[in-house]
Amino acid sequence: MTSTASVFRPIAPPQIIEGAFTPDQHARMLDVVRRNGPWSLILAQHFKSPEEVIATTSGMVPEGFTPTWDMFLSPVFRGYFAQACTALHPEIEDCFLNTRFLDLVRGYWGAKYATPENMLFNIQGPCQGGGSPHVDATRFSGVSMHNTPIWLMNTMVKTGLFQHWRQKKAQVITWYYKGKVGGGFNYWPEGPQAGPAQIKAPMWGRAVV
């Protein structure tokens, strides 16, 4: 079995980008968000029980303990600009088919080819931070977020048993937050058995690969 540290250690440190989108692109994306809401909670979209949330994060429940939804509820809502390699809103297609981002992803993996798959946004209200670490952007041959529950794919990653079928993916994560309280990005450059690092707020138009 592959060790936990090697499974979760990033292939390279995050690359920080300033001005990820132009002011015009940002304005058009915000317009789509405002015109097409309301947006549902992330929890409602991806999980059917508190146990599935735990499987995605810590993966363990003490014997005799029953988790409840109120343990995980937070004001974090999600919508999609693009899914399954298709832009859902033509007016922001250039934001999705972003050649700058594709170049960064190819460079991150040392790959010849890359294709954009999904583009989503989160709207987050004030809430407690410091939740359990989790895995994003998992995909295996024939298994993706389009046909498989998120909690199951993340469990597959944590076992280390499916590495042969795991596909190479990267994310470009962008923030628009002018505050200085909270809002940072925690990551584990040496895997979960070592300490975390943080990219601190404010983060207006800042992105990481």
Annotated model-derived regions:
Residues 7, 119-121, 156:
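Hydrophobic alpha-helical segments, principally membrane-spanning helices and signal/leader peptides
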Residues 48-49, 118-126:
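Short, glycine/charge-rich beta-strand/loop segments that flank catalytic centers
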Residues 91, 97-111, 119:
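Hydrophobic alpha-helical segments and helix pairs
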Residues 14-16, 120-122, 207-208:
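Ordered hydrophobic segments in well-structured contexts
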Residues 106-115, 124-209:
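Catalytic core of non-heme Fe(II) oxygenases with the double-stranded beta-helix
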Residues 1-101:
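N-terminal auxiliary "cap/dimerization" subdomain that precedes the catalytic jelly-roll/cupin core
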